[in-house]
């Protein structure tokens, strides 16, 4: 079956196949031992495959242990980037996700990612301070917990399914996808803080009313008002993944129906 993105065909240069009823995932395992799993894959599906792997742990019920959790670090680099540095970065990102779970004292899987290589020896916290800190605001919400049964807001699944792909409020949804220049504008607006984002949203919608455009531009809760939750914003995280994060789904034409691998 073809790889699809939310029902649309996309050229990933490979097809998803099934063997004896099981999906053959397009990845190459590098390390399978102990409690660690490392694999290499097309960067555009890396986060989706990481979520799929974490979901297995999320749904686990081990005798005498109960529910177990796991964390993932995803380093998205160029094809010819030094593997050792990418591997080390992925490990640091995984540790950062683990720190979130420990700090928040939550029973949830979590993941973190970075696009490109870091400086040699640079900690993830230093990367975030250098690239995403505009005092008093933090322009990222990474790492993300996968989600929880009672609270999906500001989780990875919220970012992927709502902030990116919700038809009404998602940045890749029906309303925002035809206003790509405005979506890209968030990259600079967030540096002005909540006030800058709020003012832009209001101005865009006033203009839309003047042109008799019925579709009001809005963001999902809990960032609907100004793009921020407290002093953090997930908008830059979403913008970085706008053209890079693909969700694999069945096209429904072959064996497996609408199953997701």
Please annotate each region the language model reported.
Residues 1-261:
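Charged, helix-rich terminal subdomains or tails
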């Amino acid at each position: 079956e073809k790889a699809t993105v939310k029902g649309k065909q996309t050229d990933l240069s490979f097809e998803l196949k099934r063997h004896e009823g099981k999906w053959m995932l397009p990845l190459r395992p590098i390390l399978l031992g102990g409690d660690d799993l490392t694999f290499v894959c097309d960067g555009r599906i890396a986060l989706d495959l990481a979520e799929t792997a974490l979901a297995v742990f999320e749904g686990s019920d081990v005798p005498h242990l109960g529910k177990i959790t796991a964390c993932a670090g995803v380093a998205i680099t160029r094809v010819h980037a030094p593997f050792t540095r990418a591997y080390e970065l992925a490990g640091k990102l995984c540790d950062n996700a683990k720190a979130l779970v420990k700090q928040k004292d939550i029973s949830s899987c979590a993941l973190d990612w970075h696009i490109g290589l870091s400086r040699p020896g640079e900690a993830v916290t230093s990367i975030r301070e250098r690239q995403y800190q505009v005092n008093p605001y933090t322009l990222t919400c990474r790492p993300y917990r996968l989600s929880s049964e009672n609270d999906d807001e500001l989780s990875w699944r919220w970012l992927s399914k709502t902030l990116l792909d919700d038809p009404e409020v998602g940045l890749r949804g029906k309303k925002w996808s035809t206003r790509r220049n405005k979506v890209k504008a968030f990259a600079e607006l967030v540096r002005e803080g909540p006030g800058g984002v709020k003012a832009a949203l209001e101005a865009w919608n006033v203009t839309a009313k003047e042109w008799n455009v019925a579709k009001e531009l809005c963001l999902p809760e809990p960032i609907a008002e100004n793009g921020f939750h407290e002093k953090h914003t997930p908008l830059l995280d979403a913008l970085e993944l706008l053209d890079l994060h693909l969700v694999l789904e069945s096209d429904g034409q072959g064996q497996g129906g609408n199953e997701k691998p």
